[in-house]
């Protein structure tokens, strides 16, 4: 598994390249992320690193979490994520990740929780076609048939129906890095990224 870096979605804007072409980009505030723990094959049975992000006041964290962070002399961090690695030799506790691990033109994968739309119907959630709106029709926004009769006598699992829409983890792959602002730890990614403004985002190579 590749090591990811955590960040916050700032919003969308446009970026003009050398030819004057307008490119829609998503601005992400990445890092700084701190390694809070290193797990090895000898002590834990697998190699992994634990990364923390977003410093907060101590009152917002539980005492067990604060005790865990103080073992590595880490600041109070709100988010902790673990990543499997083949070797732990290249990492050390308190090592900091930021925009310095990325390059302009590089393609990355971005994961975040999509915007929740609540309980949504067939047309909005699955893009079903609606029925006739006049001429005596009573089937306007209904799903139509959802299965057969006595055989099989049930609705098959996975049938597209109304229900909760959004609020799920979504990963967009191969988004190109258009620009990097090292001073403010900002990444400008070409295209859209899941989630609302302020959402927690994971960027991985």
Swiss-Prot record:
<dbReference type="GO" id="GO:0019843">
    <property type="term" value="F:rRNA binding"/>
</dbReference>
<keyword id="KW-0699">rRNA-binding</keyword>
<comment type="subunit">
    <text>Part of the 50S ribosomal subunit.</text>
</comment>
<keyword id="KW-0694">RNA-binding</keyword>
<keyword id="KW-0687">Ribonucleoprotein</keyword>
<dbReference type="InterPro" id="IPR000597">
    <property type="entry name" value="Ribosomal_uL3"/>
</dbReference>
<keyword id="KW-0150">Chloroplast</keyword>
<dbReference type="InterPro" id="IPR019926">
    <property type="entry name" value="Ribosomal_uL3_CS"/>
</dbReference>
<dbReference type="GO" id="GO:0022625">
    <property type="term" value="C:cytosolic large ribosomal subunit"/>
</dbReference>
<keyword id="KW-0934">Plastid</keyword>
<dbReference type="Pfam" id="PF00297">
    <property type="entry name" value="Ribosomal_L3"/>
</dbReference>
<dbReference type="GO" id="GO:0006412">
    <property type="term" value="P:translation"/>
</dbReference>
<dbReference type="InterPro" id="IPR009000">
    <property type="entry name" value="Transl_B-barrel_sf"/>
</dbReference>
<keyword id="KW-0689">Ribosomal protein</keyword>
<dbReference type="InterPro" id="IPR019927">
    <property type="entry name" value="Ribosomal_uL3_bac/org-type"/>
</dbReference>
<feature type="region of interest" description="Disordered">
    <location>
        <begin position="127"/>
        <end position="153"/>
    </location>
</feature>
<protein>
    <recommendedName>
        <fullName>Large ribosomal subunit protein uL3c</fullName>
    </recommendedName>
</protein>
<comment type="function">
    <text>One of the primary rRNA binding proteins, it binds directly near the 3'-end of the 23S rRNA, where it nucleates assembly of the 50S subunit.</text>
</comment>
<dbReference type="GO" id="GO:0003735">
    <property type="term" value="F:structural constituent of ribosome"/>
</dbReference>
<comment type="similarity">
    <text>Belongs to the universal ribosomal protein uL3 family.</text>
</comment>
<dbReference type="GO" id="GO:0009507">
    <property type="term" value="C:chloroplast"/>
</dbReference>
């Amino acid at each position: 598994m590749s090591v990811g870096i955590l960040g916050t979605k700032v919003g969308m804007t446009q970026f003009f390249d050398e030819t004057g072409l307008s490119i829609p980009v998503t601005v992400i505030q990445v890092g700084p992320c701190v390694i809070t723990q290193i797990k090895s094959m000898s002590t834990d049975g697998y190699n992994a690193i634990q990364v923390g992000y977003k410093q907060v006041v101590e009152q917002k964290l539980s005492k067990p979490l604060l005790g865990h962070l103080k073992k590595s002399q880490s600041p109070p961090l709100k988010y902790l994520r673990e990543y499997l690695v083949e070797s732990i030799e290249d990492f050390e506790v308190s090592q900091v990740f930021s925009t310095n691990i990325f390059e302009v033109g590089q393609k990355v994968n971005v994961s975040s929780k999509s915007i929740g739309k609540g309980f949504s119907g067939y047309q909005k959630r699955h893009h079903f076609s609606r029925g006739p709106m006049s001429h005596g029709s009573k089937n306007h926004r209904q799903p139509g048939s959802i299965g057969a009769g006595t055989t099989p006598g049930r609705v098959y699992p996975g049938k597209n129906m109304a229900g909760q829409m959004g609020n799920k983890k979504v990963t967009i792959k191969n988004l190109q890095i258009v620009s990097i602002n090292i001073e403010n730890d900002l990444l400008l990614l070409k295209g859209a990224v899941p989630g609302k403004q302020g959402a927690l985002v994971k960027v991985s190579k």
